[in-house]
Design a protein with these regions (language model features):
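Short, Lys/Arg-enriched N-terminal segments with co-localized hydrophobic residues
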Residues: 1-18
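Residue-level detector of alpha-helix initiation sites
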Residues: 40, 190-191
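Active-site entrance/lid segments in N-terminal catalytic domains of soluble metabolic enzymes
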Residues: 15-183
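Conserved active-site-proximal phosphate/metal-binding subdomains
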Residues: 163-185, 191-232
């Protein structure tokens, strides 16, 4: 059987709500974000994670704008909790995607693959929280200057696209923490409760998990891929 949606990477279930700047920013119970993954994170997975107390993200990168609109609407129907959309900024239909996100009442946007400077103010004017994914301390500084509300420090272990720096997650977390006071979320190679604890010790206030959530029943990843990964 495939893994259940939330806390699948924590050795023992959490018995109490964890309150910090990340949980307060998103209005969630646990500082656990499900990464927005191409072909993996549709409305079923995002809603399941949000219903379980984390923050589910729709992966807009692979979606036609109208497909994204459909997933947002279905996610609204499936959960009354916060969820967000991950948007790579380099996509050619970025203007249409941003307008759909605003029109459909999404309140949290994670941006990546580009400068957040152009869109952060526009999203804030519409009451949307903005989080930017960075691969270096230099980009973290630029993200804070752009006015984002939080940053994700994504190390080279991440299964998705990341930067050219090839900095590992455990090295990147303290480097980013040293240059910004923003709420910090760690990503890249985090799949257990022990890894989550290590990230918190190094200065992260939350974690973003991709691959582990891609293997859940709610993920839209190919079943052959799930089965292969689970039996490695």
């Amino acid at each position: 059987n495939f893994l259940s949606p939330l806390l699948v990477f924590i050795s023992k279930p959490l018995k109490k709500v964890i309150m910090n700047r990340v949980t307060s920013l998103f209005g969630i119970r646990y500082p656990i974000i499900q990464g927005g993954m191409v072909w993996c994170s549709g409305w079923r997975l995002a809603a399941a994670v949000s219903n379980a107390g984390g923050l589910g993200l729709l992966g807009a990168g692979s979606m036609h704008p109208e497909t994204l609109r459909e997933h947002i609407r279905k996610c609204h129907e499936a959960t009354h909790h916060a969820f967000g959309v991950n948007i790579p900024l380099m996509y050619p239909q970025i203007e249409e995607i941003m307008q759909i996100v605003a029109d459909e009442g999404v309140k949290i946007v994670f941006t990546s693959a580009g400068s957040p400077k152009k869109w952060t103010g526009w999203l804030h004017e519409r009451g949307i929280t903005v989080v930017h994914v960075v691969s270096s301390s230099r980009f973290a500084v630029k993200a804070e200057e752009a006015g984002v509300d939080a940053v994700v420090a994504e190390g080279f272990e991440a299964g998705g696209h990341n930067g050219r720096e090839e900095t590992t997650t455990l090295c990147l977390i303290p480097a980013v923490r040293a240059v910004t006071t923003l709420p910090l979320i760690a990503a890249g190679g985090i799949a257990t409760g022990e890894a989550m604890l290590a990230a918190r010790v190094l200065g992260a206030e939350g974690v973003q998990i991709g691959t582990r959530f891609a293997l859940t029943a709610e993920s839209s990843a190919n079943e052959v891929f799930k089965d292969y990964c689970l039996h490695l």
